[in-house]
């Protein structure tokens, strides 16, 4: 009999975000991948919301589109074949919730991966566009070189955020020796960020 992981990273992220998703109007899936996060967002939001999902691989968006259609939710998600770095070309409103699932598309080319330079460029901009009480969730995978670089930068950068404007939390299974994912949750606590 297989043991159920009650505190797996995916379950923790969904638990932490569920309340925020229900109240969100503009949501962004920065790293769409196979579409699981976009599906979760679409399943847990009302019809009158705006979900934007980004990926640089057509294969990822095709998988996402198939998954969303299978659940009759494709109409709720705007899929963009573009980097999340260019989010401002598509989303001008304040954003209520942003989710990152860094790394590479499972089952695809592991050399096509998110890059620290993109994160460095986009995250400060995204935080400026985050609505009051908006939330950013970043799942960081440190089992590959690009993931280690992203995580090193995240650890350094997130500690510099003004604690009067942002709450930053971190979750990890620290008794696992297999490069378990690390989850960062950022909540804007004031109306205007002071980055």
Summary of predicted features, one role per range:
Residues 31-35:
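Class I SAM-dependent methyltransferase "Motif I" SAM/SAH-binding loop
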Residues 50-55:
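Conserved SAM-binding motif I beta-strand of class I
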Residues 99-121:
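Mobile active-site "lid"/loop adjacent to the S-adenosyl-L-methionine
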Residues 129, 133-140:
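Conserved beta-strand signature within the Rossmann-like core of class I S-adenosyl-L-methionine
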């Amino acid at each position: 009999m297989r043991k159920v992981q009650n505190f797996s990273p995916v379950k923790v992220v969904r638990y932490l975000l569920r309340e925020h998703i229900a109240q969100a109007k503009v949501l962004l899936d920065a790293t769409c991948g196979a579409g699981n996060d976009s599906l979760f967002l679409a399943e847990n939001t009302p019809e009158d919301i705006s979900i934007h999902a980004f990926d640089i691989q057509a294969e990822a968006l095709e998988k996402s589109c198939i998954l969303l259609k299978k659940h009759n939710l494709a109409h709720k998600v705007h899929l963009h074949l573009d980097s999340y770095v260019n989010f401002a070309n598509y989303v001008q409103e304040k954003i209520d919730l942003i989710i990152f699932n860094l790394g590479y598309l499972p089952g695809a080319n592991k050399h096509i991966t998110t890059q620290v330079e993109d994160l460095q460029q986009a995250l400060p901009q995204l935080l400026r566009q985050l609505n009051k009480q908006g939330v950013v969730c970043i799942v960081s995978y440190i089992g590959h070189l690009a993931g280690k670089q992203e995580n090193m930068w995240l650890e350094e950068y997130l500690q510099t955020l003004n604690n009067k404007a942002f709450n930053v939390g971190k979750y990890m299974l620290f008794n696992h020796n297999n490069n378990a994912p690390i989850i960062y949750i950022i909540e804007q606590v004031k109306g205007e960020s002071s980055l």
